[in-house]
Amino acid sequence: MLSKSITKLVQYAMETGLVPECEKNYTINLLLDVFHEDEYVEPEESFSDVDLEETLNELLDEAVKRGLIEDSVVYRDLFDTRLMNCLMPRPAQVQKEFWDKYQNSPQEATDYFYKLSQDSNYIRRYRVKKDQKWKVDSPYGEIDITINLSKPEKDPKAIAAAKNAKASSYPKCLLCPENEGYAGRVNHPARQNHRIIPITINDTPWGFQYSPYVYYNEHCIVFNSKHTPMKIERNTFIKLFDFVKLFPHYFLGSNADLPIVGGSILSHDHFQGGHYTFAMAKAPIEKHVTIPGFEDVEAGIVKWPLSVLRIRHKDSARLVDLATHVLEVWRGYTDEAAFVFAETDGEPHNTITPIARKAGDMFELDLTLRNNITTEENPLGVYHPHAEYHHIKKENIGLIEVMGLAVLPARLKEELELLEEYILEGKDIASNEKIEKHAAWAAEFLPKYKDINKENVHEILQKEVGIVFTHVLEDAGVYKCTPEGREAFMRFIESL
């Protein structure tokens, strides 16, 4: 049985181009060694179009049977990554192949690297497929909703083991270059099948990789080779454009550098990008503005729920200068009438979420104004999802959400399924503790629909989730899309 599964895995590796034909025996022997097995019997049957998930599961079941691993998702993931390592080209080979293809075209290089990152099972296609995705019309264009199901839930045993595991500071975090080839442990994922492309931006060494959870097409992460904290500054804008010049078909953005309005990792300087056009990028300019000293730069307020100033020019250096000016003014800007405070008790509140892209021969930079002030009414943040929407989304509004893609928690899958059932059967939503948090929301939207049935209930809920997410984005906007809000936005622009 083991020989057969190993044969299938090696066949998969040859079909996908991970392993050349001449390395077949070598790869079989590496896999035998992982299983502490001396014997191999070539199966009589031949295999093609091998299903990776199924083959890995056969090998994992065998490893459990042999007492090599515990039967839980955390240990299985650590072990199957070790198996995939036997099929992987070395980092130097991947880098050479990437830059060889790059000479032909940047897109050919990224196509190769993205396919490799999936074939290697670093991006687990069969898990990503489970994510629920849909689009919803909004006053700001078509926004994307996803319920992220590709991160496996840890089982209680593994959680307990992680608690008792001795603390390690190697690698310092999930974004450090030392992850490449790391075997992992119960509280840190295995990364032997992970490859990084070294790049230079702003004359400093950075790494380019894909996100294992691909929230959107070719979702990449670009990270500083040093473990250094996030900081939005002049150099940030230079780095964003250096990357976009290297890969003009990709956008690149940065999370803000303050808690609440930032991303989940503030400790390691990094950006996120990819090959995808978000609703925000499609959103038009609703009001053109001219900024003194930068009359040659196209600028305007974007029709978007968050407060975005878009600037465009053929010369990225002009955009870097203007963005730096906007950032410096915004960091120190207070407008009490609009409830914008640069700082309270010495704590700074204003920052920016920037996104860079190339459109034709123009460089474009979207500067999203952020503020992380908290009050007694809104202890998690004034410009953050308000409590009435926490049943759908209470996490930070980071870069990906800012651009118009909701990344919603896995719990919603089951909750929305239950909600459908309760709505169709006319049951009391508040009576079920799993979904009682949705009762007020349902009571609000149900009267809008005359006839809710089995055919349309799913679509109705998807649409209503989209409406809630749109409100969440409006909450995160410092200047609201109202005449008063736009007036206050213009006061800031005039201060430039």
Residue map of PLM features:
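Beta-rich nucleic-acid/ligand-interaction surfaces
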Residues: 259-267, 345-351
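Catalytic or ion-translocation cores adjacent to nucleophile or general acid/base/metal-coordination motifs
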Residues: 244, 248-264, 273-334
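Hydrophobic faces of well-ordered beta-strands that scaffold small-molecule active sites
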Residues: 208, 252, 269-271
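Structured alpha-helical segments in the cores of large, soluble enzyme domains
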Residues: 206-211, 236, 240, 244, ...
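Amphipathic alpha-helical segments that form well-ordered structural scaffolds
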Residues: 239-243, 325, 468
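Histidine-centered divalent-metal-coordination microenvironment in nucleic-acid enzymes
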Residues: 217-224, 262-278, 366
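Helical scaffold of the NTase/Pol beta-like nucleotidyltransferase catalytic core
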Residues: 193-195, 225-252
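Active-site microenvironments that recognize anionic phosphate/pyrophosphate groups
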Residues: 1-222, 226-229, 303-305, 319-323, ...
